[in-house]
A protein has these predicted regions:
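PLP-dependent class I/II
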Residues: 1-188
Length: 188
């Protein structure tokens, strides 16, 4: 997610903090989000040499190779820097618009509070005021309004939802309208 940041935020890699930190850091990155290669299962690892060798040995025994098209796609993403940068800029402009819209709409719903994310393409609204476990909230929301949300507890954030805005503006608008309608039924 290091390229999916907003409002001038600059992520800091822990490996850049000191030589000691670099010697103890393993960096794992994927192509799924930044390069829209979701499901292709290709990524990179940067680690001190002994750890990198151990990772390579373990990987060779636990999974098969990356698909050929995935390798070519990753190579093109890295080699075609100008095209990649232009595509990323277009994607981030759309994500930023959706992020701001969803954030504003969520905060209009009585009982929900939500901070504005600085990276990725998820928001984590707080739904704890409704008195339901987040898992139950998500299950009931799906059943009642056909809106899929991920319980925050899956990420260590009980009482929150994870909502993605990596979809169309229309779907986000419909989804937040349905979420608001569902929340209104919980307040009755």
């Amino acid at each position: 997610y290091e390229h999916l940041v907003y409002d001038g935020a600059k992520p800091t890699c822990v490996a850049t903090l000191s030589d000691e930190a670099r010697a103890r850091t393993i960096i794992v990155a994927g192509f799924s989000k930044t390069y829209a290669m979701t499901g292709w299962r290709i990524g990179t690892t940067v680690a001190p040499l002994p750890i990198a060798k151990a990772i390579a040995e373990l990987q060779s025994q636990t999974s098969s190779n990356v698909t050929t098209f995935g390798q070519y796609g990753a190579l093109a993403a890295l080699k075609e820097k100008e095209k990649t940068a232009a595509s990323l800029k277009l994607m981030m402009t759309a994500f930023d618009r959706r992020r701001k819209f969803l954030h504003a709409e969520l905060n209009k719903i009585p009982g929900i509070t939500c901070l504005l994310a600085q990276g990725a393409f998820y928001l984590f609204p707080n739904i704890s005021s409704f008195g339901l476990k987040d898992v139950d909230f998500c299950s009931r929301l799906l059943e009642a309004e056909k809106v899929a949300a991920v319980p925050g507890s899956a990420f260590g954030a009980e009482g929150y939802l994870r909502l993605s805005y990596a979809t169309s503006d229309e779907i986000i608008k419909k989804g937040v309208e349905r979420l608001a309608r569902f929340c209104a039924t919980l307040r009755k």
